[in-house]
A protein has these predicted regions:
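Iron-sulfur-associated redox domains of electron-transfer enzymes in respiratory
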Residues: 1-155, 164-167, 172
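Ferredoxin-type iron-sulfur electron-transfer modules in oxidoreductases and energy-metabolism complexes
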Residues: 133-153, 171-226
Length: 226
């Protein structure tokens, strides 16, 4: 057993937590895994390919109840939990937060300060493709940027996969679902697409942790994570 599976199995056997949210190997890549028994812990993995932001589940009432749970996530999971705590969306008394280093050693966080220290000293290297895209956009004039985004966002089919994947999009009712009054048309159209994405970006300003889940979820590969 790895350090992760041993730690997870012990937590469930001792009754410290009722559920562990982590990663298991899927058909082609790691995927989220909800572990309820010590035996299931054998499936838990943690490596550089574990990219899903598991914090997205921590605000779901249908998943999170009164029982204490644990989450074993990557850097961005820890960073998101810090933000959710700041916004009073999670109760750390009912949550155990863990990650693992490059050697597979489990790192447990007892306080929000410990999480902050970890994220301050373990920030991943920037994605070269993202840096190249940002550099390209930075060189554009204001008019060129508007044309670029108008063309890109006109392809949006309004599936809202970006919203569903984002751990900081937790409103009970999104503005696109409000129809009295209707601020943004919910269907795909050039103007409403732009309104939706501008609204999404404004709501994420100063809050986004840079996990890239929105762009990863987009079926059209739109550069909405920039």
């Amino acid at each position: 057993m790895s350090n992760i599976t041993e730690k997870a199995a012990a937590l469930l056997k001792e009754g410290t937590v009722k559920m562990i949210i982590g990663y298991e190997m899927g058909t082609e890549r790691p995927r989220p895994f909800f572990c309820h028994t010590a035996e299931e812990c054998e499936k838990l993995i943690m490596n550089a390919e574990c990219k899903n932001n598991l914090a997205v589940y921590l605000t779901k009432k249908e998943i999170i109840g009164e029982d204490k749970i644990a989450v074993i996530g990557n850097y961005y999971v820890v960073k998101t939990i810090i933000q959710l705590y700041r916004e009073n969306q999670i109760n750390l008394d009912n949550l155990m937060v863990m990650t693992a280093d490059e050697n597979g050693e489990v790192i447990s966080f007892d306080t929000i300060e410990a999480m902050k220290e970890y994220t301050d000293t373990h920030e991943p290297a920037p994605n070269p493709k993202v840096l190249a895209a940002l550099e390209k956009i930075d060189k554009m004039s204001r008019e060129e940027r508007w044309t670029y985004w108008k063309n890109e966002l006109s392809k949006c089919i309004r599936c809202y996969a970006c919203r569903a994947a984002c751990p900081l999009c937790y409103c009970n009712r999104c503005i696109t679902e409000v129809n009295c009054p209707q601020w943004i048309e919910p269907w795909s159209a050039p103007l409403s697409n732009m309104e939706w994405q501008i609204n999404r970006v404004m709501h994420m300003s100063g809050r986004c942790v840079g996990c890239g889940e929105c762009a990863a979820a987009c079926p059209l590969d739109l550069p909405i994570g920039l």
